[in-house]
Amino acid sequence: MKADGTLDEIIKKWTGENQSTANSAVPTTTTPAGQKATPKKSKYVISSDSSFAPFVFQNGKNKYTGIDMDLIKAIAKDQGFTIEIDNPGFDAAVSDVQSGHAQGMIAGMTVTDARKETFDFSEPYYTANSILAVQKDSKIDSYDDLKGKTVGVKNGTASQTFLEKNKNKYGYKIKTFSDGASMYDSLNSGSVAAIMDDEPVIKYA
C-alpha cells in the first residue's frame, strides 16, 4: 500500500500532506499492492473508533469516513476479502477484539510492550505528536499554567500516558473520555481547561 502510493494518496486526501513519506518512523517495507497473503476467512469484522477526525468520523450523511476507513477498505480490496466495519469508539473497539467479536481493529493506537502481549500489530502507517488544545480566550500558554486545572484526554491513548506521567510535576487533574466527540464538547463547554490529542486530529477539528 505504501510502495504503490496508495497510502500517501489516502493521507494526502484528508490532510493535504504526504505524512507517511515525510515521517521516517513509517517503514517502507509494507506489503506491496498485489502481493497477497492468504486470508483465513472471506469476511472479517473490523472495529474502529467513532470520532477521531481526520482518521475516522461521521460525515454529513452520518457515514463513517476518513483515513482509517479508506485504508481498511483499500486493504480488503487489495487482499481479496470483505469487511464489516463497526465504529463503537476506541475503548469498545479494543474490547471487541479482546472478546473475539471483531477480528481486527484500525485506529490511532500507540504500540506499547504491554499491548504487544495482547495484540498483534501491523507496521505503523502514521505517527504523530500529541499536543494540547485550549479555548481561544484561554490564558494557558504552557504546562505550568495547568496547575489546579483539569485536562481532558481519551482513555488508553499515548496522550493519557504522557499526562499521567507528568500530572504531579505540573499539578493538573485528568478527566478521561471514551470518545473524542465528548472530549471536544467538554472543552467547548468549559468543563475542562484543556485537552490533549494527536496533532493532526486537533488541527483538523
Locations of regions flagged by a protein language model:
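Extracytoplasmic small-molecule ligand-binding "clamshell" domains
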Residues: D4, K13, P39-M109, I174-T176
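A ligand-binding cleft/hinge motif common to bilobed small-molecule-binding domains
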Residues: A92, G108-T118, E164-K165, N188-A205
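Ligand-binding clefts/hinges and TM-proximal coupling segments of bilobed small-molecule sensing domains
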Residues: K2-K40, A158-S178
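Hydrophobic residues within well-ordered alpha-helices
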Residues: I75, V97-Q98, L146, S186-N188
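Short, well-ordered beta-strand segments
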Residues: Y44-D49, A133, T150-V153, I195
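Flexible hinge/capping segments at coil-to-helix
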Residues: V134-V151
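Short secondary-structure boundary segments
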Residues: S50, M109-T110, K136, N155, ...
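Short Pro/Gly-enriched coil loops immediately N-terminal to beta-strands
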Residues: F119-I131, G180
